């Protein structure tokens, strides 16, 4: 506030005397504030878990149900993204593969039982459905506008600690040949993606969904994040989601 008059009014030519470094730092600060994008996208990101019943043991004082009834335990599986206000949730197929008892926890704390509505194994995408009202659906972004170096945010539930946001950049586009899916066109990012983030959202700074976080590269197979994560781009989502919503099989052409 140096140089201000007592009344707090700047002289007319004050803008010409502002330190350029101050203006540069202010611009950087604005670019680093991702709260607007997070506020738009975070309500659409959910936690996917399974409920498992286990009989209580009277000899174990930890978690015993003293009524002797089976106790319900929850195991986090991954994350998902609400894609319609009617309760449709997109996630990775590998997150829910073989799980019959699925539940979803919304960002507002509500939980619902979920059912598998459709799947596309070849792109590792699956569609769940919950019966819930007041849902916020993600807005799908345009993958054709993505560029290497753009800032992106990953939202999910790593290690079941609760909804978490990490920031990074698009490190590469069109990554393939990993043998993870039959159809690969991954966005590579250095935004931290850890166990539990699978099925969660990769968003741009407008809060639009540009990818579904799917896998990480871990050279020592410890599942520790080393700065190389992969997301299924919105272009593939655009191709697969309409069929899943309509309950149709995904039809693809083959050469031969």
Specify the residue positions occupied by each region the protein language model found:
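Serine-dependent protease modules
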Residues: 2-256
């Amino acid at each position: 506030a140096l140089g201000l008059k007592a009344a707090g009014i700047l002289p007319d030519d004050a803008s010409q005397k502002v330190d350029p470094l101050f203006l540069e730092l202010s611009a950087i600060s604005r670019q680093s504030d991702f709260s607007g994008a997070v506020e738009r996208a975070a309500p659409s990101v959910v936690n996917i878990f399974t409920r498992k019943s286990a009989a209580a043991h009277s000899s174990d004082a930890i978690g015993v149900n003293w009524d002797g009834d089976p106790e319900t335990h929850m195991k986090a599986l991954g994350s998902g993204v609400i894609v319609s206000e009617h309760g449709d949730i997109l996630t990775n197929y590998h997150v829910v593969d073989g799980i019959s008892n699925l539940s979803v926890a919304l960002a507002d704390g509500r939980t619902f039982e979920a059912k598998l509505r459709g799947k596309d194994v070849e792109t590792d995408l699956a569609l769940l459905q919950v019966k819930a009202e007041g849902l916020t659906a993600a807005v799908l972004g345009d993958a054709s506008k993505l560029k290497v170096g753009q800032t992106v945010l990953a939202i999910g539930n790593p290690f079941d600690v609760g909804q978490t946001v990490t920031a990074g950049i698009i490190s590469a586009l069109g990554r393939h040949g990993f043998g993870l899916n039959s159809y690969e066109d991954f966005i590579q990012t250095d935004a931290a993606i850890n166990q539990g983030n699978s099925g969660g959202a990769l968003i741009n700074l407008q809060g639009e969904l540009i990818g579904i976080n799917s896998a990480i590269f871990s050279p020592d197979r410890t599942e520790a994040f080393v700065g190389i994560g992969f997301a299924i781009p919105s272009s593939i989502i655009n191709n697969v989601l309409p069929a899943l919503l309509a309950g149709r099989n995904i039809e693809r052409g083959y050469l031969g």
